[in-house]
Amino acid sequence: MRDPEKLKEEMDERNRKILDVAFELFVDKKIEAVSMGDIARAADVGRATLFRYYPSKLELVIAVCADQWKRYLDGLDARRPISSVHDIPAIDRLIFTMDSYIDMYQNHKALLKYNDNFNYYVTHEGKNNDQLVDFHSSLSVSYTHLRAHET
């Protein structure tokens, strides 16, 4: 019998690889042009394994977007803890916000490109909002966390 902790660690590593590879492919080729088979090959996992993690391409696309935004916001929070933003004067908050936008443009162009591609894909695939509920709620949690520290 396999060690449950080791198994979970392997699954987490495989999931991380899938998300990272999918992000790279989606940015390089656009979401529409990338198949689940392309992702499975590039991530060196079987198609069945990929579909066990993400039963549909839309679920993977949403997971990639949520993961990338979480990583970006975590990095931003590491540079200046979001909880400390409310402790600074309004002008410094404005500077922090502008610096964040500039940093994103200069250092996170792939995320911006992916985000634009994500919006187009979701809009033009005719997906209904029910399929995006988890994604919107994850963004809502991040947004609420940020807004809670502005006042």
Name every feature range the model reports, one short phrase each.
Residues A66-Y72:
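Short, basic, alpha-helical segments at the C-terminal edge of helix-turn-helix-like DNA-binding modules
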Residues K8, N15-R16, M36, L58, ...:
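Short, structured helix-loop boundary elements
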